[in-house]
Amino acid sequence: MPHISVPAAELNTRLDRLRCAMTEKDPAWSMLLLDNTLDMYYFTGTMQDGALVVTPDQATLFVRRSFDVAKDESAFADIRPMGSFRSIKEVYPDIPETVYVAAKTMTLQKLSMLNKHLPFAPKPMDGVLSGLRSVKSAYELDCMRESGKLHRYVIEELAPAFLREGVSEARLCSEICTAIVDRGGMGISRYNQPAAEDVLGIASFSENSLRPTALDSPSGCIGTSTAMKSIGSSERTLHEGDTVLLDIPCGWRGYHTDKSITFYYGELDKHPQSGVIRAAREQCIALENETASLLRAGAVPAEIYEKILSLVDPAFREGFMNGCKFLGHSIGLTMDETPVLAKGFSAPLESGMTLAVEPKIAIPGVGLIGCENTYEITADGPAQSLTGACDTLFEVLNQ
């Protein structure tokens, strides 16, 4: 059975917004070319090997592989087969001296291949692309709400039963991800960061959750090996007295939600630092709730970040966010979009933006304690959680 396609009206609206944003950036722009599959999906509803060319009055998706699949699953108006980049020049014979591209993903190798047939100087348009994606349409919000419902169900209702004596981090993460995929989840996490990889998520026990990865995230993980700092260790197994950090994303029709939770496996009162663990948990819950109350259209991300930092208990400031300099991040087609709840982000929030809020506290000798949920900025009133509550089940008795 074929997958549900992105509606034609949605694609047309995105193309109109792209042209308006480009004209605002450069009234004299005449052409842009996108070769990244994620950008291609956003504007055409399909991910193929090819290139999307847009001018003020024309737009064509050129596909090397697979043209038939692209025609089958995309409602984009003009899709053409491409033998080589020469095919673009046959449709667009007057290539301008300057063509806008996504500089973050356009490689020198791809640019060299393009320039063999299309002699142009590239100019970056990454800010336009991230700006367009930061405000979600009704269609995109529906996808994220569906992701959030599934996410909440699996993490809050199913995951506690997966915690058992002797289960490894890797198996636990895999079982949770399988539960998501079995119910229609996407099965992948996409990132903008070059240091990030498209992976399942992480399950980390106790001090393993403090081990930093190359990804700019407070959540730590020892990984499956030195070559993969994600998912979890197949050797580290769960035992009574462990904290369990689950930071496992969910996706629905291309759109992600982010949620993390910390469990304690056993009776928390028996832990020598039970008081500190409880205090850290309560602090993170309070900080997430306060952040959610501040996430309103017109609010400034940098100001929210500074406000929340001022509320962190002095006893937890050194370990707050495990060394990371942000509190939350925009999310959508990738896990790490803009804006970010951090210094330097001064543009006001807008209705339709979606952000993950993830206060976490590193406790030496214990692990990373915290919570995370994805929120939708509404036209009026505080943000709405798409992924459930932050005050969820924490203590799981030995099964």
Question: What annotation goes with each model-predicted range?
Answer:
Residues 1-399:
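Active-site neighborhoods and metal-handling regions in enzymes and metal-associated proteins
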